[in-house]
Curated annotation (Swiss-Prot):
The record's account of how the chain is modified after translation: N-glycosylated.
Membrane topology: Peripheral membrane protein
Subcellular location: Endoplasmic reticulum; Sarcoplasmic reticulum; Sarcoplasmic reticulum lumen; Sarcoplasmic reticulum membrane
GO MF annotations, alphabetized: calcium ion binding; identical protein binding
Protein task: Calsequestrin is a high-capacity, moderate affinity, calcium-binding protein and thus acts as an internal calcium store in muscle. Calcium ions are bound by clusters of acidic residues at the protein surface, often at the interface between subunits. Can bind around 80 Ca(2+) ions. Regulates the release of lumenal Ca(2+) via the calcium release channel RYR1; this plays an important role in triggering muscle contraction. Negatively regulates store-operated Ca(2+) entry (SOCE) activity.
The name this protein goes by in its record: Calsequestrin-1
Gene label: CASQ1
Residues modified as Phosphotyrosine: 9
Gene Ontology annotations for the cellular component aspect, listed alphabetically: endoplasmic reticulum; mitochondrial matrix; sarcoplasmic reticulum lumen; sarcoplasmic reticulum membrane
Species per Swiss-Prot/TrEMBL record: Canis lupus familiaris
Primary location class: endoplasmic reticulum
Length: 56
């Protein structure tokens, strides 16, 4: 049965902070790039902890 051939996870996370200076190098280095935008967490510790848990 034919279908889509999805790549398997190889166990290596490739998370990069993309900014105005390094985005061209990131485009050259990786075949696929997904950008996730989010607001920065508030300054209090509870908000920071919630943000960290959601990112995991």
């Amino acid at each position: 049965e034919e279908g889509l051939d999805f790549p398997e996870y190889d166990g290596v996370d490739r998370v990069v902070n993309v900014n105005a200076k390094n985005y061209k190098n990131v485009f050259k280095k990786y075949e696929v790039l997904a950008l996730l935008y989010h607001e920065p967490p508030x300054x209090d510790k509870a908000s920071q902890r919630q943000f960290d848990m959601e990112e995991l």
